[in-house]
Amino acid sequence: MEPHGETDLVSFAFSSPTPFDPTRPIYLDAQNPSRAFNARQFRLLVRSLIAGLRALGLKPGHCVLVQLENTVIHSALFFAIVGAGGVYMGCDVGSPAHELTHLLRLAEPQLVITAPGALSTLEVCSTQGESFSGQVLLVDELSIDNIVQFAHRAAAAGAEAQTEGLVDQTAGPCIRLESLLQHGESDWLRFEDREQSKRTPAAMFLTSGTSGLPKAAISTHHTIISHHLSVHYRVPYPVVRLMALPMYHSFGDFWTNIFPIRYGEPLYVLPRFDISTFLDAVRQHHISETYMVPAMVQILSQSSLPVAESLASLRYVGISGAPIDGFSIQRFQRLLSPDAVAGNLWGMTEVGVVFQNRYRVPLQFGSVGTLLHGYELRFVDPATGEDVAGTPDSPGELYVRGPGLLLGYKWRTDDKDEQGWFRTGDMVYARDGNYYIIGRTKDLIKVRGQVPDSLNSWTSHSTNRLCDSRYSVAPAEIEGILLKDPGVKDAAVIGVMLPDGSSEVPRAYVVRAGISPESTADQLTDLVQTQLASYKALDGGVVFVDEIPRTGIGKPHRARLSQLDREREKLASILGVSVPA
């Protein structure tokens, strides 16, 4: 592991431990590689944006909300905001008005950087009692072209002499982002003090919001540097990354901003995941490393396109963001080169990446890997609050402590206990140095049933002790079985209460794959019944839908799915029909 260094984040990122060619492009648009920055151009662009942000009135501690799709300028915006002393926050460009209203109240940004298509949503927020009084900076395709051209010219001839030709016009209450480039250059906020690094916010990353509105987890300069150092290790292949995950999300941030400028490792950027453009980008740019969420893995595994041929250059695929079963990873692994690894990993916005399967480390399918440097763990019985062994026979809720933990939540104090432990909400156990995620404690389905036929798995003999004589069923385990069926494109499982209130039971929401013959509810019920213990049966039924609601990072949005389920049952009651269908 590299030495931490007691420094600010931007200085850390721009201080390469090994020399690399500063003229090699390192941030590139995957669909238009002429939109690219080398290290010299990128450094100048960051310093120019810092000068522009300060000229616009950004002060230390001010928040800037970036509401854009993935673009080649994203990392420059990130470092410029942090370098000007500000606090970065990103969100989905397609955020609906009620979510954006919540974020404006939560983050209190002084600036919003957004796309033309999102302006109408920002206007709607003002009608919902959240009028944004700060400055709006507009970014469109012309802006990106102008910024790239500026960086190319300025790196060759000097920033102050190369501002001519930039568009400098207002668009209603907005100004174009490239107008910030007319103020010369300014150095970033620097410090070499451990305590200042640990207490100075650099970014706020939104939590997944699967059970409600997202929270803003505050990451300091020290936190983000710690995240990077925990996941970085040397590999025996040339690293060329592709990013199709949201770059504003913490999982995307881990691999997006620092690696290119610190190590000279090229990053190709796609605006979003689309299977055809993704496969084209991997093939055309000889991508060796990328990161996915399980939904992307399922799409690629089920595709009729020449996936294996297109992915031949890959050497490592990191998978996280939501639960994924061992079968799905093994199926995907067969599409990759024999020299490649598809490795699961586990982390949270609040704590960073804690467990990781690394390249050429023997894989245990279904495991999220081994513990990364710097983290401490506890396993706690959620019913008693007492520590447990964290073995397959005695799993526990995971508590984490270490330098990668959040500073806190914005406007909340329920982040860590007095000893610095963060309660993750995930049930976990360890076996032979590898860690296994059972599921979210709040998502586990509490089933009262018969004694199971087999005592071979953790769920068969431990969770009745943990959950008041009821068995805890992990939705992800059932989802993994359902996804083995070639007729299933996507699936999510929730718990529903029996009419007499005696027990929760699993109910599956399934998206068909569109092949013939179609899988039936009875077939899927039988599939689960034959492969899992009897108390994990789909006694709540199977419901076929067109789409599973998911978060921006690909997690099943179980709270929204449960709400839709309640509305469905209410409608069925009014119509006098039975459910599930």
Swiss-Prot record:
GO molecular function: ATP binding; CoA-ligase activity
EC number of this enzyme: 6.2.1.-
Example of a GO biological process term: terpenoid biosynthetic process
Practical and industrial applications: Pyripyropene A and its derivatives have very unique characteristics of selectively inhibiting the acyl-coenzyme A:cholesterol acyltransferase 2 (ACAT2) isozyme. Therefore, pyripyropenes are expected to be developed as a new type of anti-atherosclerotic agent. Furthermore, pyripyropenes have been shown to exhibit anti-angiogenic activity against human umbilical vein endothelial cells. Finally, pyripyropene A also exhibits insecticidal properties.
Keyword line: ATP-binding, Ligase, Nucleotide-binding
Residues annotated as binding AMP: M204, F205, L206, T207, S208, G209, T210, S211, G212, L213, P214, K215
Annotated metabolic or biological route of this protein: Secondary metabolite biosynthesis; terpenoid biosynthesis
Region spans: AMP-binding: 477-555
Gene3D superfamilies: 3.30.300.30, N-terminal domain of ligase-like
Catalytic activity: nicotinate + ATP + CoA = nicotinyl-CoA + AMP + diphosphate
Family to which the UniProt record says this protein belongs: Belongs to the ATP-dependent AMP-binding enzyme family.
PANTHER family associated with the record: ADENYLATE-FORMING ENZYME AFEA (PTHR24096:SF317), LONG-CHAIN-FATTY-ACID--COA LIGASE (PTHR24096)
Protein role: Nicotinic acid-CoA ligase; part of the gene cluster that mediates the biosynthesis of pyripyropene A, a specific human acyl-coenzyme A:cholesterol acyltransferase 2 inhibitor. The first step of the pathway is the synthesis of nicotinyl-CoA from nicotinic acid by the nicotinic acid-CoA ligase pyr1. Nicotinyl-CoA is then a substrate of polyketide synthase pyr2 to produce 4-hydroxy-6-(3-pyridinyl)-2H-pyran-2-one (HPPO) which is further prenylated by the polyprenyl transferase pyr6 to yield farnesyl-HPPO.
Protein name according to UniProt: Nicotinic acid-CoA ligase pyr1
Name of the coding gene: pyr1
